[in-house]
Amino acid sequence: MLEKYRKNIELLKQAVETDAVIRPIAKHRKPDGSLDIEGNLLLWNKALEPFEKTRLWEQGTPGFDDRDPLQEEPYFVFVPAPDEEKCRGTILVAHGGGFTWRTGTEGLNVAWYFHNAGFHTAILCYRLVPYTRFDAIADMQRAIRILRAKREEWKLGEKIAVMGFSAGGMLSGNCATHYDFGNPQSEDETERFGCRPDAAVIGYGAMTAVTFPKPFGMMQDDPMMGNGIEEKFYLSIEKNVDQDTPPMFIWQTMSDDGRNGMCLAKALQDAEVPYR
């Protein structure tokens, strides 16, 4: 069954070499100064069109409709490791983009790098606004379940890590702190598998809306940070860490608010969860 996904290796190589998902900064905004979201999504859709995709819900995504014609139903692109017998594990990669667009290099380029490092990789295409952050979390959780369900068929090995950047890092942290081990009674076979990742790599994610105000300059009433105090606490990664949380690697850039990484690192330290 892996054969049909092997074409994704060459397609990914070509996409990275030709900068298929990269737009010059000058084209990121329209003349009026607003983000050119339509141009971004059209570029992503065109670049990903030839890939063999795995839809997250074969019978249709719950709650999905045609409110945004530029958004396909959520999927991931599976890219087999160069050597299946020596595979180092599986990494589910989630791009950033503020939940409004898709930062292509944080998806395709990252997947290509880790493919060449000996990993199976899967590029997640999750729902954006007007869908909610909870919808995007459900997409990543479903992708993890599928990878667990396909472990033997796709020769994935035991370990699955999530790796995200910016908004994708926020999703990775949420899925590392909100998970289950599957429902054995579910009629949907995929739902019988758990959605806990074995590790999470979080790149410059806005971790919290409660430990300190306005992460990354986002207003506290931004719905992507939660509507109401209960949602804000649920989505604040550091508030949901416990001793069963998987290990994490946290990193940020010099221009990011360092409190994001530090508040999560402190929570992991307090819970005695390994982190770097």
Residue ranges and their predicted role:
Residues M1-P69:
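N-terminal targeting or regulatory segments adjacent to alpha/beta-hydrolase or S9 domains
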Residues D66-P82:
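A short loop-to-beta-strand scaffold at the N-terminal edge of the catalytic core in hydrolase folds
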Residues C87-G96:
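Short beta-strand element of the alpha/beta-hydrolase
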Residues R102-G104, N109, I123-E158:
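Catalytic nucleophile-loop/oxyanion-hole region of alpha/beta-hydrolase
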Residues R142-P215, I229-F233:
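Primarily recognizes the serine-hydrolase "nucleophile elbow" in alpha/beta-hydrolase
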Residues D244, F249-Q252:
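Short beta-strand/loop motif that positions the catalytic acidic residue
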Residues D256-C263:
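Conserved alpha/beta-hydrolase "acid-adjacent" motif
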Residues Q269-R276:
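Catalytic histidine neighborhood in serine/cysteine hydrolases
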